[in-house]
């Protein structure tokens, strides 16, 4: 007869014995997240479940798949989000970018476009924190749009989702005039792959991460074109900490925009705000 899980204690004991690939605080974290996001839903309406139902989840973790993908959920800005293969797992640095926007525009009613939304964390948090803002989100990946729409429903916020390629000319006609544009674009150079974790390289979508070495500003230039076309007066961008000089040279050549760089909590230059210069 198969071993069964019927409560938290039986789950904890089984996981402790089976999950030899993690230890210490990380193991405690894995146990809690999997209990909440995997085991509890499987137990609904049942007295117990076979451990055979849980073996595939542990096998995915043994292969190095990120916990957020295996559990199907992560938190961003204290808010739950569904994630899975096909969307980037949101990072804490992006929370700081969102916080900057909220800090700068606390008393305004804005129309906002997020470019490259992925799982939708940026537009959803902005809309949740500022319900009177009109928020649009543009994403090229159909799988990402599907997950983002689910997250909008999960968090009960209306977002205008746009399935569009940033580099397609139609992108400029899909969205009305915007006050503010935000983006966390691909910015990691191919030559920086050695800095990435094996888990990230093997499982997260590389199209959301990497840009060619010879043109690291590719997405930033295109986003700026959209900002100009949408007559946006403010632009917030997440940055590659290793490209500060390249960004500084780029903004020095921009006409009509003033730039402000900001460091993250680790002291790394990770954010940029561009504002239309006033006469």
Q: Which residue stretches match the model-derived regions?
A:
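Proline-centered flexible-loop/turn and helix-kink motifs
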Residues: 20-24, 131, 157, 205, ...
């Amino acid at each position: 007869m198969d071993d069964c899980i019927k409560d938290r204690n039986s789950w904890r004991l089984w996981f402790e014995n089976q999950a030899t690939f993690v230890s210490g605080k990380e193991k405690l974290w894995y146990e809690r997240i999997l209990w909440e996001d995997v085991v509890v839903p499987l137990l609904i309406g049942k007295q117990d479940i076979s451990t055979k139902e849980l073996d595939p989840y542990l096998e995915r973790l043994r292969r190095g798949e990120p916990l957020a993908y295996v559990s199907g959920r992560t938190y961003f800005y204290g808010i739950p989000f569904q994630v899975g293969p096909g969307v980037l797992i949101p990072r804490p640095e992006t929370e700081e970018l969102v916080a900057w926007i909220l800090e700068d525009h606390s008393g305004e009613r804005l129309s906002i476009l997020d470019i490259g939304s992925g799982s939708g964390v940026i537009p959803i948090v902005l809309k949740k924190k500022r319900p009177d803002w009109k928020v649009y989100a543009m994403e090229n990946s159909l799988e990402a749009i599907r997950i983002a729409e689910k997250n909008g429903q999960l968090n009960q916020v209306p977002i205008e989702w746009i399935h569009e390629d940033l580099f397609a000319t139609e992108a400029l006609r899909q969205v009305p005039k915007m006050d503010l544009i935000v983006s966390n674009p691909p910015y990691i150079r191919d030559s920086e792959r050695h800095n990435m974790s094996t888990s990230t390289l093997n499982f997260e979508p590389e199209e959301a991460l990497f840009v060619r070495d010879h043109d690291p500003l590719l997405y930033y230039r295109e986003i700026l074109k959209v900002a100009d076309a949408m007559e946006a007066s403010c632009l917030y961008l997440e940055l590659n900490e290793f490209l500060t000089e390249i960004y500084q040279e780029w903004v020095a050549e921009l006409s009509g925009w003033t730039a402000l760089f900001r460091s993250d909590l680790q002291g790394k230059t990770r954010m940029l705000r561009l504002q239309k210069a006033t006469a």
